[in-house]
A protein has these predicted regions:
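Long, low-complexity, charge-biased intrinsically disordered regions
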Residues: 1-183
Length: 183
């Protein structure tokens, strides 16, 4: 079975994914907090410790336009350990792009490999040249969509802190919580 970015349990040697980390008593507290932080970051914050980006808004299913119900996609949580970060235990939520039918361009323009090679060659061939890179935090989360997309997440995948703060028991339908994606 293939998996993306599982977390290694050093004691057992097993690779664990998000749902396994939440069920394992040894890992549950740490990774539940990481999951709450990610959902809070995507929404309107959580517990005063994480600011939200207003990327998603939890909604009632009936708020989804009828003609868009067929486009509701899923969310996948990816766990990883990034030892170089201040908070190394990371959960990232990704939407199932195979179910999104967004009418506008969703591509990310990038430079051609040949252009990059020419550019780097120019840098290393120039005396006293300097080179820098930058990482833009939450770059994609801050790009507004012209029309919202919709998704759903299993209630069992949502940490209690998020469920309580956003009153998701009131919005859940048959074990699912729906959300609107604005960015």
């Amino acid at each position: 079975r293939e998996s993306a970015n599982p977390v290694l349990d050093w004691d057992t040697g097993k690779l664990l994914e998000y749902r396994q980390l939440l069920r394992d008593p040894k890992h549950k507290e740490l990774w539940t907090k990481a999951g709450a932080n990610e959902l809070g970051r995507l929404a309107q914050g959580v517990g005063g410790q994480i600011d939200g980006t207003n990327t998603i808004f939890f909604i009632h299913k009936h708020e989804i336009p009828q003609d868009r119900l067929k486009d509701v996609t899923y969310i996948k949580f990816v766990a990883s350990v990034r030892t170089e970060k201040d908070d190394p235990n990371r959960i990232r939520a990704t939407l199932g792009g195979n179910l999104i039918h967004y009418p506008d361009d969703v591509g990310t323009p990038t430079a051609d490999l040949l252009l990059i090679k020419i550019f780097l060659n120019s840098v290393i061939s120039s005396d006293r040249a300097r080179f820098a890179t930058a990482d833009l935090s939450n770059f994609y989360l801050m790009t507004p969509l012209k029309r919202p997309e919709f998704g759903r997440v299993k209630m069992s995948d949502i940490p209690d802190e998020i469920i309580n703060e956003y009153k998701l028991h009131e919005k859940a339908v048959e074990g699912w919580v729906y959300f609107k994606v604005m960015r």
